[in-house]
A protein has these predicted regions:
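Subset of outer-membrane beta-barrel
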Residues: 19-274
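Generic N-terminal leader/processing signal
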Residues: 1-2, 102
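Hydrophobic alpha-helical segments of integral membrane proteins
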Residues: 10-12
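Sec/Tat signal peptide C-region and signal peptidase I cleavage site
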Residues: 14-18
Length: 274
């Protein structure tokens, strides 16, 4: 009972955070992946990367945890030459969010992007809008680097809604043919609920060409469905077929800012792409 009450207080006290949706792939990687988001993940993690994945994709996701459920639908079209764009809608216990992302390549290995979020609180109906800026650079075939600044418009009002300006450095490394590593440090200069800096790191391992195993760890990293940050681990499985992708993740949260302790979550997602 105390555990559920504590979680409820966190959900009420922190109505919004930098990342409104984390896919099973992201959660399996411990919240990492900004250096190389796959398909519609770029809408939330790093809009500038959409320029490097020229597909049309539709995604539906579902996450369940101790105290509720999250639902997500998104669409992204990265096939056009002028610019690439996507839109996602997330329904959470505390609010509903519309995310938009658009990107453009400046040169073949350098992309820039802008994101927007529109958050509506379920209880009060109050609304908040903010933006993100991002850039992705493919330095070598085995090293990718991205910089993302989320919640660019920071003020006393946005801080009251837990929308702190946050800078992410997303990195992706391919040390082996079927192993990809992601490390995403973050820093929020004015974050008040815990340490200002954190990191998420994960590994994605290809098994039998179509199946993926993901392992991740976050240290003061973001926990989207709880609207806070914390410490924990993620594990995930994925299948990537010719036109469809299935993903699952399990996350164990050891502690979270705001006083909430141990909790778990499960997440499923399906994507079709052309």
């Amino acid at each position: 009972m105390l555990k559920k009450i504590s979680l409820g207080l966190i959900l009420l006290a922190t109505p919004s955070l930098a990342v409104e949706y984390q896919s099973p792939r992201t959660l399996g990687l411990g919240g990492a992946g900004r250096g190389g988001p796959l398909l519609n993940d770029s809408i939330y993690l790093n809009p500038s990367y959409a320029s490097f994945t020229p597909t049309y994709s539709l995604t539906g996701g579902y996450l369940w945890f101790d105290k509720g459920r999250n639902y997500n639908l998104s669409v992204e079209d990265s096939r056009t030459e002028m610019f690439q764009a996507g839109m996602g809608y997330t329904k959470r216990e505390q609010n509903s969010t519309l995310n938009l992302g658009a990107s453009k390549t400046l040169i073949s290995n350098l992309g820039i992007g802008v994101g927007a979020k529109y958050v509506i609180d379920n209880d009060t109906g109050s609304k908040t809008m903010n933006f993100s800026l991002s850039s992705s650079y493919i330095a070598t075939p085995w090293a990718y680097v991205s910089v993302v600044v989320d919640n660019v418009l920071e003020s006393a009002d946005t801080q009251a809604r837990n929308l702190y300006r946050t800078v992410y450095l997303g990195t992706k490394f391919l040390p082996l043919d079927k192993v990809t590593l992601y490390v995403d440090p973050l820093y929020s200069p004015n974050y008040k609920l815990g340490p200002k800096a954190g990191v998420a790191a994960g590994a994605e391992i290809t098994v039998m060409s179509d199946f993926l195993l993901r392992l991740g760890r976050f240290q003061h990293g973001e926990i989207s469905h709880l609207n806070t940050r914390g410490i924990g681990n993620g594990i995930g499985l994925g299948y990537l077929g010719p036109k469809v992708r299935f993903d699952y993740s399990f996350t164990r949260i050891n502690s979270a800012d705001g006083g909430y302790g141990l909790s778990t979550s499960n997440s499923l997602e399906t994507t079709v792409f052309f």
